[in-house]
Structures are given as structure tokens and as C-alpha cells.
């Protein structure tokens, strides 16, 4: 038999403490050089986007 969980129990118990998180984890992969990524291959307009 499964036990009944309290309301929002996962939210209370599964939060990662901020002191154990990597401070650089929020940065994007191409943070330093915006031109490194290149054009969007699915867009005919490249980096300009389609309008």
C-alpha cells in the first residue's frame, strides 16, 4: 500500500541548498562569444531571424 504524501511534500523536501549549487551553472554555453554558435540552420535568414 502506498503512503499518502502531504500536499507539496516534494517541493519542501527536494530543494537543493543554494550553498551546494554551482555558481556558474546558470550561464549559457556560449556566454563569452555570441558569434561562436553560428547561424540557426533552420532559418533561411540565419542569425537575423525570419520576419
From Swiss-Prot:
Residues 1-51 are annotated as: Disordered. Residues 11-28, 40-51 have a biased composition (Polar residues). It comes from the Bacteria. This is Uncharacterized protein YkzP.
Amino acid at each position: 500500500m502506498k503512503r499518502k504524501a502531504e500536499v507539496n511534500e516534494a517541493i519542501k523536501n527536494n530543494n537543493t541548498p543554494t550553498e551546494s549549487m554551482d555558481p556558474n551553472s546558470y550561464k549559457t554555453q556560449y556566454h563569452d562569444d555570441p558569434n561562436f554558435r553560428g547561424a540557426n540552420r533552420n532559418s533561411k535568414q540565419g542569425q537575423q531571424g525570419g520576419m
